[in-house]
A protein has these predicted regions:
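Terminal transmembrane helical module of multi-pass membrane proteins
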Residues: 139-201
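Transmembrane helix-loop junctions in multipass membrane proteins, especially transporters and channels
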Residues: 35-46, 86-89, 116, 147, ...
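Membrane-water interface at loop-to-transmembrane-helix junctions
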Residues: 13, 58-72, 169-174
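Cytosolic juxtamembrane amphipathic/interface segments immediately preceding
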Residues: 2-16, 158-167
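Pore-lining transmembrane helices
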Residues: 65-134, 141
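Perimembrane loop-to-helix junctions flanking transmembrane segments
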Residues: 43-65
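Alpha-helical transmembrane segments of multipass membrane proteins
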Residues: 25-30, 77, 135, 178, ...
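N-terminal signal-anchor transmembrane alpha helix
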Residues: 8-42
Length: 201
């Protein structure tokens, strides 16, 4: 029993590492994509980011609209990955959603650095920590369990293996609840706390 649990933990650790590497590669791809943009599109990106943060300093933004946009995006990825995990046919889309989220995460960071230079390091840190980073790590965990659940469903149906998924479904649902709460907290932070923090610098 102990050997089985140890082997299972080692296997899951490798899968988590694989997802982290995939996320890291996707973040690196966002940097390469940004560097490969022509001057016109680079200017569009930098102007958009500059306006976004400049409006915070001038207090020319609608906090509630910003909250709705942020929480809507977070919920789209969270619920999407969770639902696809119980659909079996959604395994490739789970990967695409995970890669899309990590790509946007990296693109935001590198876009800030490109716009503000060295001064952008502090801005990027304030933007990322703590909740956006926690949310991305939560996406790693959710993606792992989504794929795990989907593969177990496939094994039950097509390989005639018996996995007791009811108990796992309870844990999977609890994970969704945690991520939904984190999604809302991240959106609240971005809309109501982040602007005030940036205003101090």
């Amino acid at each position: 029993m102990y050997k089985f649990q140890k082997a299972n933990i080692q296997k899951q650790s490798k899968q988590y590492i694989w997802l982290l590497i995939l996320g890291g590669v996707t973040i690196l791809a966002s940097l390469i994509y940004l560097l490969c943009l022509d001057s016109v599109n680079k200017k569009i990106v930098t102007d958009s980011i500059y306006t976004y943060f400049h409006n915070f300093r001038k207090e020319e933004y609608d906090a509630f609209s910003l909250f709705l946009g942020s929480v809507g995006s977070n919920l789209l990825f969270t619920i999407g990955i969770w639902v696809l995990g119980i659909s079996m046919i959604g395994i490739p889309i789970v990967f695409l959603l995970y890669m899309a989220k990590t790509f946007l995460f990296g693109f935001s960071i590198f876009g800030i650095l490109q716009t503000f230079g060295l001064k952008g390091i502090l801005t990027a840190l304030i933007y990322v920590f703590p909740f956006k980073l926690l949310f991305i790590l939560g996406m790693v965990v959710l993606t792992f369990h989504s794929l795990y659940f989907a593969f177990r469903l496939c094994s039950n149906l097509f390989r005639k293996k018996s996995y007791h998924l009811q108990q796992y479904m309870i844990r999977y649902s609890k994970l969704l609840g945690i991520l939904l709460i984190l999604s809302v907290i991240d959106a609240l932070w971005e809309a109501y706390v982040l602007p005030n923090l940036l205003f101090l610098f």
